[in-house]
């Protein structure tokens, strides 16, 4: 089958339609399909929009329309046209033919847009967030925005590809953070900020047809539980959803990416293991070269060329949808600026800065660093201390084989990476009550 066969005149089409034994036009899908493929008004008019997962009418067909999406009013006009012109009246057969001809005439508006762009050679990704929002023009900001753009392009050309990153613009109330994401989506219908519930059965409907989705309200009210829900949501690559008029549910691979905005600096709950999915960029509107709405036409032109630059990188294939290991380490440290102060980690670090022994254990830190002299730690408190030592404290190395502590018995713990004692004598008893024994020391018996 070919949905784009050369148009014919109405009389030629009528002459070629299948007829009944009595000479009337046969009410068949084949006849309806022939009309949609060859009628001078309808040929090439109906297409399947891969982005919206809907049928569109993509050229004028003789009556006024408000949008491209095929709707109930359009169907009434089409039924009337096929009845009056060809005597085709079976609504179900006509609808089936529309489904077939649309499926044979697919298009993706974002792919078409991106593929049409030609870069002028001027670098903009590195300076964009500085230009519009006053962010630092450093390597981190450049890599953050570049990664987000490449993720968006990849999701358009490869729906459902793995991309778990959320670019978060932080600070600067009234700076234009939400407007930046809206203009980044190029067309307003490709942008949405209407995602409110992540556990909604109809969440696919909120994503459908959108490319850039801003999470503003959720980031503003985020807590430890909701952040975990957002992280889980970001990791999904598809939704399973049954459109009301369809019989069976189907996988709907994601074609969108998610951006976050927050006026509060400490929008990330404390997470010592890191929130690798969230990439925060601080904005300073007073340092911006231009407000993004000062000249919207110029801003859109700038952003369009930025997409063209990103497409050059995408076409080259020389990229990964993840930070480099060095940038990942920087991100982990940088994220701490956007979390509440970690008071327990600070207390443990202060204790270790003054401590002269060569090893410590969780119970020791609980009692001596966190000042629980007469209490016994609960299991979750032990896990929290372990997390602090393993994720936040440097200069100490974990040992898994229990050693003897004079006050706390046999315990797993941490030793200095460069052990130090008061006198330098390896056999001298340290403050933790443990006697260091040199590996090659001759035993006195």
Please provide the spans of the model-predicted regions:
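Residue-level preference for alpha-helix termini and adjacent loops
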Residues: 40-41, 45-50, 56-57, 62, ...
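N-terminal nucleic-acid engagement/recognition segments and initiation subdomains in replication
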Residues: 1-124, 139, 143, 375-376, ...
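P-loop NTPase catalytic core of nucleic-acid-dependent motor ATPases
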Residues: 98-208
């Amino acid at each position: 089958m070919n949905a784009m066969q050369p148009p014919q005149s109405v009389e030629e089409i009528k002459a070629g339609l299948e007829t009944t034994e009595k000479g009337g036009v046969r009410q068949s899908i084949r006849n309806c399909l022939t009309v949609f493929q060859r009628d001078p008004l309808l040929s090439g008019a109906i297409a399947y929009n891969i982005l919206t997962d809907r049928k569109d009418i993509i050229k004028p067909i003789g009556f006024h329309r408000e949008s491209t999406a095929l709707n109930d009013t359009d169907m009434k006009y089409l039924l009337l046209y096929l009845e009056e012109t060809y005597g085709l009246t079976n609504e179900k057969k006509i609808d089936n033919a529309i489904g077939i001809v649309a499926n044979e005439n697919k298009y993706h508006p974002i792919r078409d847009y991106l593929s049409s762009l030609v870069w002028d050679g001027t670098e903009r990704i590195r300076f964009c967030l500085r230009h519009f929002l006053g962010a630092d023009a450093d390597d981190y900001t450049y890599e953050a925005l570049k990664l987000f753009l490449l993720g968006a392009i990849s999701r358009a050309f490869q729906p459902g590809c793995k991309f778990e990153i959320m670019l978060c613009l932080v600070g600067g109330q009234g700076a234009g953070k939400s407007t930046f994401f809206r203009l980044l989506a190029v067309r307003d219908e490709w942008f949405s900020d209407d995602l409110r519930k992540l556990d909604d059965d109809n969440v696919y409907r909120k994503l459908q047809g959108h490319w850039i989705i801003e999470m503003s309200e959720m980031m503003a009210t985020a807590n430890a539980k909701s952040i975990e829900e957002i992280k889980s949501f970001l990791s999904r690559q598809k939704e399973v959803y049954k459109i009301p008029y369809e019989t069976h549910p189907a996988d709907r691979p994601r074609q969108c990416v998610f951006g976050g905005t927050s006026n509060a600096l400490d929008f990330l709950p404390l997470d010592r293991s890191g929130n690798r999915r969230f990439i925060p960029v601080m904005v300073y509107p007073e340092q911006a070269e231009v407000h993004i709405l000062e000249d919207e036409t110029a801003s859109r032109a700038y952003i369009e060329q930025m997409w063209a630059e990103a497409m050059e990188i995408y076409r080259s294939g020389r990229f990964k949808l993840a930070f480099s290991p060095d940038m990942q380490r920087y991100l982990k440290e940088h994220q701490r600026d956007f979390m509440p102060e970690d008071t327990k980690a600070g207390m443990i670090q202060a204790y270790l800065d003054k401590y002269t022994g060569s090893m410590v254990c969780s119970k020791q830190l609980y009692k001596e660093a966190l000042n629980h002299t007469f209490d016994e730690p609960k299991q979750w408190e032990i896990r929290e201390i372990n997390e602090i030592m393993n994720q936040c404290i440097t200069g100490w190395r974990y040992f898994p084989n229990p050693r003897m502590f004079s006050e706390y018995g046999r315990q797993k713990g941490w030793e200095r990476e460069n052990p130090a004692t008061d006198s330098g004598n390896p056999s001298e008893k340290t403050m933790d009550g443990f006697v260091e024994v040199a590996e090659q020391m001759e035993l006195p018996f």
